[in-house]
Amino acid sequence: VNGATSIHNLQIVENNSDNTYKHTGSWDDEGQEYLESVPVELIRGAVCNPCLIIDGTSVEFNQVGLDKKNNTQTVLSVSKEDIVKETVVYDDSYTIEHKFKNLPDKNIILVWDSGLLPSEKLIKDDLSYFSVYAQNQQSYEEEFLTSVNGQESFTFDDNVGWAGLKSKYFIKSITNHDYNNLKAKKVVFNVNPSKVIDGAQTVNVNMECHYGYQDLKGGSLQVSSYVGPIDMKHLNQEENKHLSQLFGFGWFVIGYLGMAVMWLLTTLYSIIPNYGVVCILFAFIIRLFTGPLTKKSFLSNQKMQAIQPKLKKIQEKYKDDTGKLNQEIMGLYQKEGVNPLGGCLPILIQMPLLIALFQVFRKTIEFRGASFLPFWITDLSQPDVIIQFEFLKNIWGINYFFGHGIALLPIIMGVVMFLNMKMTATNNINPSQASTMYIMNGFFILLFNTFPSGLNLYYTVYNILNFLQQKKLQKINS
């Protein structure tokens, strides 16, 4: 943290067990070059982080004195216009406490300017996650900045306990020290919609927390700031537990499945410290559970195929009597023990898990910068691009939806899916349906081209195992 008792520039400096930086990758000062080996920088050139506005006058604290320092914390203090600001910086924590004393009997606005710096190389993807959020007396609310559309500010009122700005992997938050009792009357996020990103690639969002003087007991205000990663290690710390709801994968079943998947992946990583290997092992584990469903689906399709001649006879015989036709078809299904939905249900049952996996691999910071093979996949949170097309970087539609290069894993996965579809189509579907499936297969290759390589690695291995099982079942059946 550089500057005085305000945060002017802030980098995330956390070390791995081998003393390397855990979180790396930042844009340079001009926002033109992405520097992959430097620590993540989230705040740059800020003026007011945080400062006060009293009766329309900004009170900034730019001179600092070291009060005390020990093995766990550093205390800095500064005075201006009889107001004392004390800042407590803790070791091994991204939380910083800000204490203001001797405040006048006037309404106070606590201001935090500068916003956040995007941290990802694929900046368009990163920006799609930027949002402002607040916890008020009623509920947690969030507004994504992609929905600005000319709106110059977002206001959260009804007594706000904590609020902040969130990117894909990092957050900047302000929390009232006793947020169950002391709450801001409102929090306003000022956004310049025509300049959400400035020349240095900063997402410009200015946060204002409004307090009534009658709420500030003894003329003091104490808040804590958290500027750091969205991970359970830090958000589960006692002082940050209220922020843990920012770490989620969706609503209801998807959210719970996502948390279960994340727990299993991190547990496996504690045994095998390579998330690439963990993704492969995880695919085997999931196949143990979904394998019986795949077998059931295959057998159901085989039964359906076996009764096709009888179905065609019924359809020809009762083509002019819809009621009788449906009755005879259902009777045939019952007689032959065929469930018309038997081939679809196993797939539908797996859908919540697939959605949860998608959320985990796209949103979890543990995969950011995690390497599988140093000569191929060096970041499981990014596509494994093997050929770059620099001229596509600034074409937003192509860049955002299909990337600006060719990734290898989606091609491997696409080939496996094609072989699987071809094997299935030969036995179960007509040529026109097969053609549609092949076109969809090509579309999935393009779509997965922008997905994290961790997700693609899992899904590729999963599809290979699925293909091998289908091949074995087909051989047994023949």
Regions found by a protein language model. Name each.
Residues 1-242:
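Soluble non-transmembrane domains of integral membrane proteins
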Residues 98-100, 112-126, 133, 158, ...:
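Helix-loop-helix
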